[in-house]
């Protein structure tokens, strides 16, 4: 056996050991053997609930390895921890030197080619939605047949090793999970168990149109909500991401909404004129409990934007969903960089002049797009994603790996930070005192023109694997950092203060009510920003309490969407409760707020971000 592999086995690192058993093989074969060895050495956890693995267990870190699978970057490596382990267990200096060389190579696989100034909400990150419809329809056995039918190639050998490892793990797992995963789902129970296993394989990333495909198996099972609550618990514990609900199966969708009691999944509801009244009522019930999920999406606006701004064709346009926070992608057939990074408009403006501003934006975008393409090519060579290659169309059919052109669609989410701040600053330079978010024509027009220019510019550049760029405003918790290095700006923002956290108003400056705020945001060219233009809004919790208030809230949302608004995510907490939570966060462990593009427990936020949430205007109708 290769000496490096032998050392890694002794140190209890089977994934890394497998990668070095035949280190002169192709990179994709090395990753495939690494995954196989990981699963062969992993002890399946016990069965302790309806789902397998149960929420408290993690397929990918069962023994706390230093070298781990990573769903976005293929590999995670705690090099310092592995070196410490080597110093403890390896007496031979030659073996220690070999281990250092191993760690250097593993670190190389994780190389990040996105310059720090462009790491706006991401740095070549990749969320994904596997083809769960096909998984439930074919089972693992169907995928095995398709891999066996591939022509001989390094990729086929890598996928065969990956499948062999998963199959070995399932064979040793308790209960009937092996049968559920191997065969097509036959009922709600087997569908939920199979889905959960494959979702865990992809690290609970994003589920796509969950109520659509899972609703096909729902037949009024009395314990269905308990299954959903256990699944949501797993998603919350493992920092999973997005579930989209379409209301195609209203009875099941209502259960999905009713089960939402935690900060995750980061769910969304496609809304439109045909959304059933009972779905709206269930949505307001959830919001009324203080849970800010799901957010609402304007289905018609996305469909229009996708027709004009994506390369998706035919029925695939109906498969749009969201990954991560709320990044556009196409269910089961796409590899969309989400988020790749982006541009900080306020930083660019502060280091430019009004006359040079647009030219400087273009120069930054050229540099960023070049970095994204270079990072994409590096990933194609050195970061194979074999789980996604198996379960995303058309990788098997094309005999090409997920990062190397196998998926049907590619593209990149390009984040825009400081949009509102820059618009307010440009307005101030022209002597306009109003702030965006108050339905003030002059500053709103400045924001509209700026957004139109920037989004149109972004869309001109080919990105990951030559795919389109999708402009977005999705800042996670990073909006504080993206303001920390920016000097004081013309709008009155002090040096180092956070930039705006969404496509809406700077916190506390929207003073003319919710209709004015939504009117301002609706003027932005949302059809050009389908990456998603996140809108964070604080609403008075009582709005979801009474039937009369609910009618007004529904009318407000539908009016926003009728004007072209794209997305809205609320935080429904009264100011008094939020003040108490700010004074003593530990006393409010279950308080959930919307931050950037997702939900988070308030007591987990930094003090700076807690204060930013407190500063937001609390709107009432």
Give a label for each model feature:
Residues 1-159, 186-621:
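Conserved catalytic cores of very large enzyme subunits
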Residues 159-162, 166, 170:
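Low-complexity, highly charged intrinsically disordered N-terminal segments
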Residues 178-183, 196:
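Long amphipathic alpha-helical scaffold segments
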């Amino acid at each position: 056996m290769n000496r490096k592999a032998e050392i890694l086995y002794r140190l209890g690192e089977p994934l890394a050991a497998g990668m070095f058993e035949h280190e002169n093989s192709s990179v994709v074969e090395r990753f495939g053997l690494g995954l196989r060895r990981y699963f062969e050495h992993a002890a399946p956890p016990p069965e302790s609930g309806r789902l397998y693995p149960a929420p408290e267990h993690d397929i990918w870190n069962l023994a706390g390895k230093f070298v781990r699978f990573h769903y976005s970057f293929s590999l995670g490596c705690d090099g310092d921890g592995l070196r410490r382990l080597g110093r403890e267990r390896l007496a031979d200096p030659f073996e220690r030197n070999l281990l250092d060389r191993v760690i250097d190579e593993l670190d190389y696989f994780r190389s990040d080619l996105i310059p720090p100034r462009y790491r706006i909400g991401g740095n070549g990150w990749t969320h994904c939605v596997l083809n769960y419809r096909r998984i439930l329809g074919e089972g693992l056995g169907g995928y095995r047949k398709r891999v066996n039918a591939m022509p001989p190639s390094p990729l086929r050998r890598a996928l065969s090793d990956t499948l062999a490892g998963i199959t070995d793990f399932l064979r040793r797992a308790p209960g009937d999970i092996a049968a559920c995963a191997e065969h097509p789902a036959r009922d709600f129970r087997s569908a939920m168990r199979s889905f959960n296993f494959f979702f865990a394989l992809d690290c609970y990333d994003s589920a796509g149109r969950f109520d659509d495909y899972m609703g096909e198996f729902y037949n009024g099972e009395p314990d269905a909500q308990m299954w959903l609550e256990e699944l949501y618990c797993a998603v919350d514990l493992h920092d999973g991401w997005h579930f989209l609900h379409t209301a195609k199966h209203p009875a099941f969708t209502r259960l999905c909404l009713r089960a939402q009691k935690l900060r995750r999944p980061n769910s969304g509801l496609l809304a439109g004129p045909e959304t059933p009244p009972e779905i709206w009522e269930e949505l307001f019930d959830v919001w009324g409990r203080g849970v800010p999920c799901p957010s609402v999406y304007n289905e018609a606006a996305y469909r229009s934007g996708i027709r004009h701004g994506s390369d998706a064709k035919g029925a695939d346009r109906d498969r749009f969903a969201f990954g991560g926070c709320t990044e556009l992608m196409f269910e089961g057939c796409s590899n969309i960089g989400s988020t790749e990074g982006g541009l900080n408009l306020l930083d660019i403006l502060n280091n430019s002049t009004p006359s040079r501003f647009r030219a400087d934006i273009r120069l930054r975008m050229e540099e960023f797009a070049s970095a994204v393409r270079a990072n994409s090519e590096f990933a194609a060579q050195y970061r194979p994603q074999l789980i996604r290659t198996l379960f995303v169309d058309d990788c098997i059919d094309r005999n090409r790996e997920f990062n190397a052109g196998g998926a049907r669609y590619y593209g990149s989410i390009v984040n825009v930070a400081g949009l509102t701040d820059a618009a307010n600053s440009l307005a101030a330079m022209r002597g306009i005192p109003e702030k965006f978010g108050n339905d003030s024509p002059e500053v709103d027009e400045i924001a509209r023109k700026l957004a139109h220019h920037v989004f149109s510019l972004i869309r001109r550049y080919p990105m990951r694997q030559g795919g389109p760029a999708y402009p977005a405003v999705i800042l996670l918790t990073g909006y504080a950092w993206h303001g920390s290095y920016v000097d004081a700006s013309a709008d009155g923002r002090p040096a180092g203060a956070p930039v705006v956290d969404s496509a809406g108003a700077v916190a506390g400056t929207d003073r003319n009510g919710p209709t004015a705020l939504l009117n301002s945001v609706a003027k932005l060219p949302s059809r050009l920003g389908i990456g998603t233009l996140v809108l964070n809004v604080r609403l008075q919790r009582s709005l979801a309490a009474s039937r009369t208030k609910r009618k007004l809230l529904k009318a407000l949302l539908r009016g926003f969407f009728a004007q072209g608004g794209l997305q809205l995510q609320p935080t429904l907490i009264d100011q008094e409760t939020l003040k108490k939570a700010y004074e003593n966060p530990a006393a409010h462990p279950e308080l959930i707020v919307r931050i950037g593009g997702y939900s988070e427990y308030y007591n987990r936020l930094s003090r700076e971000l807690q204060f930013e949430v407190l500063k937001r205007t609390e709107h009432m109708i």
